[in-house]
Swiss-Prot record:
It is found in: Endoplasmic reticulum membrane; Golgi apparatus membrane; Cytoplasmic granule; Cell membrane. Disulfide bonds: none annotated. GO terms for biological process: amyloid precursor protein metabolic process; amyloid-beta formation; calcium ion homeostasis; membrane protein ectodomain proteolysis; Notch signaling pathway; protein processing; regulation of canonical Wnt signaling pathway. The record marks T257, M258, I259, M264, A265 as: Cleavage. PANTHER family: PRESENILIN, PRESENILIN-1. Residues 254-256, 343-347, 398-400 are annotated as: Important for cleavage of target proteins. Residues 12-29 have a biased composition (Low complexity). It comes from Xenopus laevis. This is Presenilin-1.
Length: 433
C-alpha cells in the first residue's frame, strides 16, 4: 500500500510539473511573439523614415531641374537602345515603335543584370569594380559637367572653364573616394542620390514618352520576377552574397548605415558563431580514432588525452576561491551583440532612378500643372511604405518597384486624364467644392 501511494504521489507531482512546464513555455512563446511584433512596428517605421528622406530628395532634385532647366525637356535625339522614333503619323505606328523600344531596352537591362550575376558568381570582382568605376566616372565627371553647364546657362551665371574644371574635379574625386572606398556616411548617401538623379535626368531627356511609360510598367514586372523567382537573377545575387557573407557593391546599393559595417545579408548571429566554431574544430588535429566520435562530440574534443597533454605542459591546475573570483572578473571575449539601432535598410539605386524617372516624366509631360506631379510623388511614397511594411513582415528581400510604380502609373493617368480636366472645368465655371 505504501508503495502504491508513493507511486501515485510521484505521478501527480510529475503531471503538475509537466503542466507548469508547458504553461511556462507557452508564456515564453507569447512574449517572443509580442517582442517580434514590437520590433516589426518599430523598425518598419524607422526604415520608412530612413528611406523617405533620400527618395524624396532624389525626386525633388529631378523635378526642380525639369521645371527650371529647359535642356532636359527639349528633344535632342534618343538613346541607341531606343532606335524607333515616336514622331509618326498614326497612333498605331507610334504604339508599335514604343513597344519595340521598350522591348530592346528591357532586353538590355536583363542581359546586363545576368552578366553582373555571372561575374559575381564566378568571383570576377575586379571586372565588376572596373565596370562600376567607369560608370561612376562618367556620371560624376561627364554628366555632372553637362548638368552644371546647363544650370549656369539657365540662371545666367558666368563661370570660366578653369573654375568649372576645378569644381568638377573636386566633386568627382571626392565622390569616387566616398562611393568606392570610404568616407562619411552622409556624404556617401548624398553622392548616391546625386548620381541617381543625374541618371534619371538622362533617361527623361532621351527616352520618348510612350516608351518611358511602357518601360516603367515592364520593369516593375521584371523586378517582381527577378527577385521572387527561385532562379531570378537578383535573387541569385542576394543569395550568393548571403552564402559568402559579403556586402553588395556600394555603387549599386543605397544604405542607411555604413555599408562596410552592416550587411543586410547577415543572418542569425548565432549561425555565424557556430560556423566559426566549426571552422575552428576542423582545424584541430584528432588524436583519437573515429570509434570515439560520439564521446568527442559530447566533450567538444577536450578528452582525457587533451587533458594529459595540457597537464604535462602547464602542470595540474588547483582551483581556489580566489582564482575563481579573479577569472570571473576577467572581461569575456564573446562576440558583441548586434545593436538593433545599427541595423540598416538598403535600396537599390535602380529603384531611385525609376522612381525619379516616373515623377520627372510626369512633371515634363503633364498638362503644365503640379497636381499630376504631386499625385505621382505621393503614390511612390505610399508604395514604398507598403513595400517596407511587407519587408518587416516577411523578413526577406522584396522588390521595391512593383507597388510604387503601379501606384505611380495609376495616379498619373487618373490625375492627368480625369482629375485635372474636372478641376479645369470647375475653375472655368467657378464652381467651388
Amino acid at each position: 500500500m505504501n508503495d502504491t501511494s508513493e507511486r501515485r504521489s510521484n505521478e501527480n507531482s510529475e503531471s503538475q510539473s509537466n503542466g507548469q512546464t508547458q504553461s511556462s513555455s507557452q508564456q515564453v512563446l507569447e512574449q517572443d511573439e509580442e517582442e517580434d511584433e514590437e520590433l516589426t512596428l518599430k523598425y518598419g517605421a524607422k526604415h520608412v523614415i530612413m528611406l523617405f528622406v533620400p527618395v524624396t530628395l532624389c525626386m525633388v532634385v529631378v523635378v526642380a531641374t525639369i521645371k527650371s532647366v529647359s535642356f532636359y525637356t527639349r528633344f535632342d535625339g534618343q538613346l541607341i537602345y531606343t532606335p524607333f522614333t515616336e514622331d509618326t503619323e498614326s497612333v498605331g505606328q507610334r504604339a508599335l515603335n514604343s513597344i519595340l523600344n521598350a522591348t530592346i531596352m528591357i532586353s538590355v537591362i536583363i542581359v546586363m543584370t545576368i552578366l553582373l550575376v555571372v561575374l559575381y558568381k564566378y568571383r570576377c570582382y575586379k571586372v565588376i569594380h572596373g565596370w562600376l568605376i567607369i560608370s561612376s566616372l562618367l556620371l560624376l565627371f561627364f554628366f555632372s559637367y553637362i548638368y552644371l553647364g546647363e544650370v549656369f546657362k539657365t540662371y545666367n551665371v558666368a563661370v570660366d572653364y578653369i573654375t568649372l574644371a576645378l569644381l568638377i574635379w573636386n566633386f568627382g574625386v571626392v565622390g569616387m573616394i566616398c562611393i568606392h572606398w570610404k568616407g562619411p556616411l552622409l556624404l556617401q548617401q548624398a553622392y548616391l542620390i546625386m548620381i541617381s538623379a543625374l541618371m534619371a535626368l538622362v533617361f527623361i531627356k532621351y527616352l520618348p514618352e510612350w516608351t518611358t511609360w511602357l518601360i516603367l510598367a515592364v520593369i516593375s514586372v521584371y523586378d517582381l520576377v527577378a527577385v521572387l523567382s527561385p532562379k531570378g537573377p537578383l535573387r541569385m545575387l542576394v543569395e550568393t552574397a548571403q552564402e559568402r557573407n559579403e556586402t553588395l557593391f556600394p555603387a549599386l546599393i543605397y544604405s542607411s548605415t555604413m555599408i562596410w559595417l552592416v550587411n543586410m545579408a547577415d543572418g542569425d548571429p548565432g549561425l555565424k558563431q557556430s560556423a566559426s566554431t566549426k571552422t575552428y574544430n576542423t582545424q584541430a588535429p584528432t588524436a583519437h580514432p573515429r570509434s570515439d566520435s560520439a564521446a568527442s562530440d559530447d566533450n567538444g574534443g577536450f578528452d582525457t588525452t587533451w587533458e594529459d597533454h595540457r597537464n604535462a605542459q602547464i602542470g595540474p591546475i588547483n582551483s581556489t576561491p580566489e582564482s575563481r573570483v579573479a577569472v570571473q572578473a576577467l572581461p569575456s571575449n564573446s562576440p558583441p551583440s548586434e545593436d538593433p539601432e545599427e541595423r540598416g535598410v538598403k535600396l537599390g539605386l535602380g529603384d531611385f532612378i525609376f522612381y525619379s524617372v516616373l515623377v520627372g516624366k510626369a512633371s515634363a509631360t503633364a498638362s503644365g500643372d503640379w497636381n499630376t506631379t504631386l499625385a505621382c510623388f505621393v503614390a511612390i511614397l505610399i508604395g514604398l511604405c507598403l513595400t517596407l511594411l511587407l519587408l518587416a513582415i516577411f523578413k526577406k528581400a522584396l522588390p521595391a518597384l512593383p507597388i510604387s510604380i503601379t501606384f505611380g502609373l495609376v495616379f498619373y493617368f487618373a490625375t492627368d486624364y480625369l482629375v485635372q480636366p474636372f478641376m479645369d472645368q470647375l475653375a472655368f465655371h467657378q464652381f467651388y467644392i
